[in-house]
């Protein structure tokens, strides 16, 4: 059997063994995709014992390509929500998550200096302790750029594997410990979250308001600032028994009922100006109006602002809200449409059908992947990651590398959405498939390279010490920030658990947090709020630590 055939066969075996290990769960918690790393270690141990020789060049290419695929698809997935998460609505959660990253970096630096841990080893421990595989790839990349011997770089994967299991368990232990310390009643926390509905970011809500302000009588909607802006959408108006879709020229009268869509604070301001909230239903049922969800798939409208399409004037149809990559947004007139946007339309059936034709609404297009933008994005990302930035006093030029470059490029392209007929939207199923393929390839190679000396390091070497160092890097930031968030910010416990899981980019921890109260969306919401920024920081941090430690000796 040729070297290439043998290498591919071994990688396939690693994937099978690793995915099987990852699917084994104890009390609902498992290693998940991280099991591939341990599958690689097991197979790598026996490959080393058997004296087999695998193609090192091929393994290196597969490892790097897997990493590129993984970080690129993550960037495309979270790009639309990344910049939104930095706005005021998610600022508090992101600040706490950033604090976790900073404290983790400080603990790593202190351990490195106190115990004289080799640079590749401490970076591997850091990456494993925070359960972040792209951080491992980024760290290995910068070490190679700094001229570190390959046998030392491979130690990073081994120390990563030592710290990884407690990284998974440590966050679960932290959630449990904080619950005990603060005597949390999960049901009460869920009810509090449901009553406020503002944790992690302002949600889109709807209210019905009766016009009671005499100053608004006989004014057109376009002349009422709170209704003519981009923060509140008036999607329905009911006068006596008639329900209609209002246009900017529609004149409102005392006693009219308005159905408004917006964020809670903006709706409260509208209520102060217009009148009292009422329980009267403004449902389209039994009327000549209907509500429909339409998907943007027509290339001719990509990048166009909602106001430029004149749906209100031409079709008497109102866009009440917009869903982009799972994030609900107020459909302000200045928003530019992107491929895959889901719009809530209110209007007559024939008018909605006409608007749907303009927007595309071709569901089959959502299942198709444009491969040209994928490779354009990857190519641009690799180029971006290869650009050197020279900093005086540093031994090597800083680069984003094969982990940071594709990630940042994907975040930008995901936010832009489309350029002409090229759109970077990727169906969730395709994105997940490419992402899982990438991480399986990457972890398989890392595990294989680490497997030969893993048992010896664990039993006769410093493996147990590495596990202890990793436990500190995992636990100290989580416990510190958890206590601060609860005591100082009075953060909801379920929201805090989601934030902690997001700060470790740890899906098993999110699953655990969701199971604390299955019907509450608090944990998932805060996880999604901090995930994009934290993923970016987790990839950049090992590179900064590596250059810092290298420069100060």
From Swiss-Prot:
Keywords: Cell membrane, Membrane, Repeat, Transmembrane, Transmembrane helix, Transport
InterPro entries recorded: AAE_transporter (IPR050144), RCK_C (IPR006037), RCK_C_sf (IPR036721), Transpt_YidE_put (IPR023018), YidE_YbjL (IPR006512)
Membrane topology per record: Multi-pass membrane protein
Segments forming domain RCK C-terminal: 191-276, 279-361
Single Gene Ontology BP annotation: potassium ion transport
Designated name of the protein: Putative transport protein YidE
Gene Ontology annotations for the cellular component aspect, listed alphabetically: plasma membrane
Signal peptide feature range: none
Entry keyword annotation includes Endoplasmic reticulum: no
Segments passing through the bilayer: 4-24, 28-48, 65-85, 95-115, 158-178, 371-391, 393-413, 439-459, 464-484, 493-513, 533-553
GO molecular function, one term: monoatomic cation transmembrane transporter activity
Keyword Nuclease among UniProt keywords: no
PROSITE patterns per record: RCK_C (PS51202)
Similarity-based family: Belongs to the AAE transporter (TC 2.A.81) family. YidE subfamily.
Subcellular compartments: Cell membrane
